[in-house]
Amino acid sequence: MDENHNTIPDEFLELKESRTRLSYAGGENIFKQGAFSPYVLYIINGLARTYVATGQGKQVNLRIAKAGEFLGLSAVFGESHYLTSAIALKDTLVCMINKDSFGSLLKDHNEFAMQLIAQNFLNEHRMIEIIRSLNYNQMRGKLASAILYLSDEKFLNEEVFQLLTRQDIADFASISLESSVRFLKEFDKENIISLDGREIVISDREKLKSISASG
């Protein structure tokens, strides 16, 4: 299930009658939290931001999904509605698969199922990191953790920061927009990062890791 532009896993070929491709423009909703979930979605190319609404117009950004990753997997395991929302960060092509057919596919292909479990483990690890940051980090630490995640090597060629607003970054850190802007400027003055428009370049990754770890 590695990134392979414009292709789908071989296992999907068995699901000709149960899958379809859809294109989403950058900024377009792929699905909304609480909506009926008849499909699992596989990203063929592009990027999607997933988030959860927390009430009073606020949200927490969870992760960025890229080509070769799935969205809406909870549908396969009994959830009748999507637990999160997903929005395309740029033009994104997905393969939508009927959740019942996808569940049958997993039963018939053990190796494919194990790959999916491995990917789900990474997503679970990401959720644990978010919970840790929310519970233990101060605002600087939360922002440092968010920047480290968004600059991970898996996004090396994606120019992620160009696709995100400052509000998006604040929502990854679960802090206010005002606090996000203020601490970004502080990090810049401390030569931890360099700001250039929307771009954020890390100048001192070890210092950023230290801020993230210490909270």
Predicted regions and their residues:
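Regulatory nucleotide-sensing modules
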Residues: D2-L41, N45
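Short aromatic/basic micro-patch
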Residues: V40, I64, M96, L163, ...
